[in-house]
């Protein structure tokens, strides 16, 4: 199951709304989207049904009724469980220094931060991170192409590379979820999805005002993939999003 599901890329709409020039239009049209008819159907279901009637109300409740220290702490626990996955993937990339940032974050926040409820590790500048590292990004770092765009019901946007990465990441964590119980995995991903959506509530209208929300979201998704594969170093283009925006997309 995806760590953060529908509309976690909403903030990207800020830089993508409006009319594109000829060069931009050409680049957009060259995206690998051979399943566009199917994808648009799934997009409408996710956006008009799942988000509108499930995620958005849950996100509003998360913001309005859950005290900030509690919501941040619960999200911290969920995110802390991704650190071992990032540690392994960084080692596969031959990046031991970055790998041990995740390793140290995990044990420090687990032992001293009540399982990640408090992010003690980020008190050290050297242990602060912007994104976790999935196996999909690891494949991308070795030059594996993302592949065709796919929109699945509830799961939302993905590609063959990212789906493969999600399966491998899940395999890393399988023994843990077997130990604590599978339903807790759903709780983890649910908390991350609602927390991510809650952070983007104020930007929903920007996506609705886009000339083609489907294209807007698709471009944001591909830019986000490139951003994460390159560790926050994005090749500049007329459609590129600011770094501070991309850091909030996961």
Swiss-Prot record:
- Give me the residues lipidated as N-palmitoyl cysteine: 19
Q: Which cell locations does it reside in?
A: Cell outer membrane
Q: List the GO terms this entry assigns under cellular component, sorted alphabetically.
A: cell outer membrane
What is its membrane topology? Lipid-anchor
Signal peptide feature range: 1-18
Please tell me whether the keyword Transcription regulation is annotated for this protein: no
Instruction: Note the lipidated residues of kind S-diacylglycerol cysteine.
Output: 19
Question: Any one Gene Ontology biological process term?
Answer: intermembrane phospholipid transfer
Keyword terms: Cell outer membrane, Lipoprotein, Membrane, Palmitate, Signal
**Which PROSITE patterns does the record cross-reference, listed alphabetically?**
PROKAR_LIPOPROTEIN
Taken from the record, one Pfam family name reads MlaA
* InterPro entries named in the record: MlaA
Q: What is its main location?
A: membrane
Q: What this chain does, per the record?
A: Involved in a phospholipid transport pathway that maintains lipid asymmetry in the outer membrane by retrograde trafficking of phospholipids from the outer membrane to the inner membrane.
In the record, the note on similarity to other proteins reads: Belongs to the MlaA family.
The protein here is known as: Intermembrane phospholipid transport system lipoprotein MlaA
Give the source species. Haemophilus influenzae (strain ATCC 51907 / DSM 11121 / KW20 / Rd)
Query: What gene is behind this protein?
Result: mlaA
């Amino acid at each position: 199951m995806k760590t953060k599901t529908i509309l976690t890329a909403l903030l990207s709409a800020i830089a993508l709304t409006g009319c594109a020039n000829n060069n931009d239009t050409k680049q957009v049209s060259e995206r690998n989207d051979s399943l566009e008819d199917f994808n648009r159907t799934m997009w409408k279901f996710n956006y008009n049904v799942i988000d509108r009637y499930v995620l958005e109300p849950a996100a509003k409740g998360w913001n309005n009724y859950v005290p900030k220290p509690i919501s941040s702490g619960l999200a911290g626990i969920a995110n802390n469980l991704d650190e071992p996955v990032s540690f392994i993937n960084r080692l596969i990339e031959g990046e031991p220094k970055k790998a041990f940032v995740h390793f140290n974050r995990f044990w420090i926040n687990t032992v001293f931060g009540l399982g990640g409820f408090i992010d003690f590790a980020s008190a050290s500048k050297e242990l602060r991170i912007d994104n976790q590292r999935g196996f999909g990004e690891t494949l991308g770092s070795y030059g594996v192409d993302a592949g065709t765009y796919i929109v699945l019901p509830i799961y939302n946007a993905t590609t063959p590379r990212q789906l493969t990465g999600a399966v491998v990441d899940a395999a890393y964590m399988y023994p843990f979820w077997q130990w604590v119980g599978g339903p807790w995995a759903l709780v983890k991903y649910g908390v991350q999805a609602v927390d991510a959506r809650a952070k983007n509530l104020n930007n929903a209208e920007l996506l609705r005002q886009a000339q083609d929300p489907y294209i807007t979201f698709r471009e944001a998704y591909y830019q986000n993939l490139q951003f994460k594969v390159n560790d926050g170093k994005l090749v500049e283009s007329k459609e590129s999003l600011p770094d501070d925006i991309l850091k909030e997309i996961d």
